[in-house]
From Swiss-Prot:
Family classification: Belongs to the aldehyde dehydrogenase family.
GO biological process, one term: peripheral nervous system development
Phosphoserine PTM positions: S293
EC number(s) given by UniProt: 1.2.1.3, 1.2.1.94
pH dependence: Optimum pH is 9.8.
Catalytic activity: an aldehyde + NAD(+) + H2O = a carboxylate + NADH + 2 H(+); a fatty aldehyde + NAD(+) + H2O = a fatty acid + NADH + 2 H(+); (2E)-hexadecenal + NAD(+) + H2O = (E)-hexadec-2-enoate + NADH + 2 H(+); hexadecanoate + NADH + 2 H(+) = hexadecanal + NAD(+) + H2O
Outcome reported for the amino acid change (mutating H411Y): In SLS; severe loss of activity
Protein name (record): Aldehyde dehydrogenase family 3 member A2
Role summary: Catalyzes the oxidation of medium and long chain aliphatic aldehydes to fatty acids. Active on a variety of saturated and unsaturated aliphatic aldehydes between 6 and 24 carbons in length. Responsible for conversion of the sphingosine 1-phosphate (S1P) degradation product hexadecenal to hexadecenoic acid.
């Protein structure tokens, strides 16, 4: 591992990842890979998650292509140095912010969307001019293998490498020094990544998860609400970090919600859900058994059917769920949807705030003020009102968590910023040295007073014009005098 990281760092230090033209070429090559090897990519992901190729394309591939196009369109502007506002003492100097690549980045991908959650941060790292080591999840082994095969065929083989393996390989990687680590996965491993990064003072982006609540107000269209929740919850068999984890609603709505979700499930997946090409499977037996354990002692309103041999768990809804039970103590990450009755929106807000900050919050209501209130009085990584998941699709939004649901953000410009150092640059002249006497010893009260005048914004707007004229006269006199020094 050490030799691999050293090799990538030497490639970065050569400087060839920095020019804008090179970055654009690599992004175009990545897009070409996705387009030319689409069939191979679709087949690998489908094998890992029992996904239809249509779902793979719509949930992963199209997002990657859209992100690449967005980067190609905007990158020339983003890499340009940006001038900043100056104060009186620097008004004749050149001041700007220059984005610079961080260096060698480690990206640790996730298994639930193994292509997009690995490639999307890679796009940002390439756009920012970094070298990258990619560590796909070993749980989605087919996707990991296809990435290791294809990426070297299209990208610079010294700057961007794939390292496959399990816990042992990841542990060894984390012992190495990186300039940024980007991890997508669960909170427990996120803490391990952060601890390892701290030894080298390496900054991290942690895309984690949590229990994303979904509040349903009585003032809403339940038919539409339940269709949207059903889509977001059971997509990818519930293995989505921003899936609605549980529902909060008044008790009077509970039976209607159950019935409408049940009917929607039938509409989406047919009478025999197990045979539907649009319904996926749990990634492995360990996660299958973990999810089953969450059903113990619960009231199953519908669903609950399982098949260990194929890792099938039917779309399931639980009612009258006790907040103290196991299913409400950990992220479900599966096709189980608990309903927790609350008296009103006040109790819902308190319920959310008493728990760890989630990755997403969903609120359904015709009452716009109620939605705004829940946004104002809670905290989460992101919010979608009257829908679920959809804020992820807007690449002008930063996507990321807060608190235990993660730190840092990416997508679009936010990815570029995550993998860049915003370097402040001030270029002064060696002339006009007389004007600098104000800051040189020996110090005096008059210098302090002049410093206040130049640097502190204490002007009354009504007197601003007169003060500005006076100030310009003083500056002109100082500059004229300085020319004789």
């Amino acid at each position: 591992m050490e030799l691999e990281v050293r090799r990538v760092r030497q490639a970065f230090l050569s400087g060839r990842s920095r020019p804008l033209r090179f970055r654009l070429q690599q992004l175009e090559a990545l897009r070409r890979m996705v387009q030319e090897r689409e069939k191979d990519i679709l087949t690998a992901i489908a094998a890992d998650l029992c996904k239809s190729e249509f779902n793979v394309y719509s949930q992963e591939v199209i997002t990657v292509l859209g992100e690449i196009d967005f980067m190609l369109e905007n990158l020339p502007e983003w890499v340009t140095a940006k001038p900043v506002k100056k104060n009186v003492l620097t008004m004749l100097d050149e001041a700007y912010i220059q984005p610079q690549p961080l260096g060698v980045v480690l990206i640790i991908g996730a298994w639930n969307y193994p292509f997009v959650l690995t490639i999307q941060p890679l796009i940002g790292a390439i756009a920012a001019g970094n070298a990258v080591i990619i560590k796909p999840s070993e749980l989605s082994e087919n996707t990991a293998k296809i990435l290791a095969k294809l990426l070297p065929q299209y990208l610079d083989q010294d700057l961007y490498i794939v390292i496959n393996g399990g816990v042992e390989e990841t542990t060894e990687l984390l012992k190495q020094r990186f300039d940024h680590i980007f991890y997508t996965g669960n909170t427990a491993v996120g803490k391990i990544v952060m601890e390892a990064a701290a030894k080298h003072l390496t900054p991290v982006t942690l895309e984690l998860g949590g229990k994303s609540p979904c509040y349903i107000d009585k003032d809403c269209d339940l038919d539409i609400v339940c269709r949207r929740i059903t889509w977001g919850k059971y997509m990818n068999c519930g293995q989505t970090c921003i899936a609605p984890d549980y529902i909060l609603c008044e008790a009077s709505l509970q039976n209607q919600i159950v019935w409408k979700i049940k009917e929607t499930v039938k509409e989406f997946y047919g009478e025999n859900i197990k045979e539907s090409p649009d319904y996926e499977r749990i990634i492995n037996l360990r996660h299958f058994k973990r999810i089953l354990s969450l059903l113990e002692g619960q009231k199953i309103a519908f669903g609950g059917e399982t098949d260990e041999a194929t890792r099938y768990i039917a779309p399931t809804v639980l009612t009258d769920v006790d907040p103290k039970t196991k299913v409400m103590q950990e992220e479900i990450f599966g096709p189980i949807l608990p309903i927790v009755p609350v008296k009103n929106v006040d109790e819902a807000i308190n319920f959310i705030n008493e728990r760890e900050k989630p990755l997403a919050l969903y609120v359904f209501s015709h009452n716009h003020k109620l939605i705004k209130r829940m946004i104002d009085e809670t905290s989460s990584g992101g919010v979608t009102g009257n829908d679920v998941i959809m804020h992820f699709t807007l690449n002008s939004f930063p996507f990321g968590g807060v608190g235990s649901s993660g730190m840092g953000a990416y997508h679009g410009k936010h990815s570029f910023d995550t993998f860049s150092h915003q370097r402040p640059c001030l270029l002064k002249s060696l002339k006009r040295e007389g004007a600098n006497k104000l800051r040189y010893p020996p110090n005096s009260q008059s210098k302090v007073d002049w410093g206040k005048f130049f640097l502190l914004k204490r002007f009354n707007k009504e007197k601003l014009g007169l003060l500005l004229l006076t100030f310009l006269g003083i500056v002109a006199a100082v500059l004229v005098k300085a020319e004789y020094y």
